[in-house]
Amino acid sequence: MSKINMLSLLKKLFKSTEVDLSQLIKDGATIIDVRSKGEFATGHVKGSINIPLEQIATSIDKLKSHSHIITCCRSGNRSGMALRTLKSKGLKNVTNGGSWQNVNQYK
C-alpha cells in the first residue's frame, strides 16, 4: 500500500471517530477520565468525572444510569482497558476517546 493510500485510509478512520466523539458530547455523553487523581489535577476535560482505572470495576453501579460513556486518559491505553472492563460488566454504550486532550478538543 502506498503512503498516499495509507494516509487516506487513516484519515477516513480517524475522521469517523472524531465525528462520533463530537456528536456524543453534544448529545450529553458522560466523560470518565481514568487517570490517577494526581494526573487529573494537572488538567482534564471540563465536566469530566475522575474514576482511576483501578476503581472502574467497582464503579459499575454508579455508571449504569448514564446513556453513553466516553473514557479518556493520558494516551488512550488505560481508557481502552476501562472500555473493555465496562463492556465486560454489561455496559454497552462506551467509547474510548483516547487522550483527554483529544476529547477536550470537542468539548
Name each model feature, range by range.
Residues 2-30, 37-68, 77-107:
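Rhodanese-like catalytic fold shared by cysteine-dependent sulfurtransferases
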Residues 73:
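Short cysteine clusters
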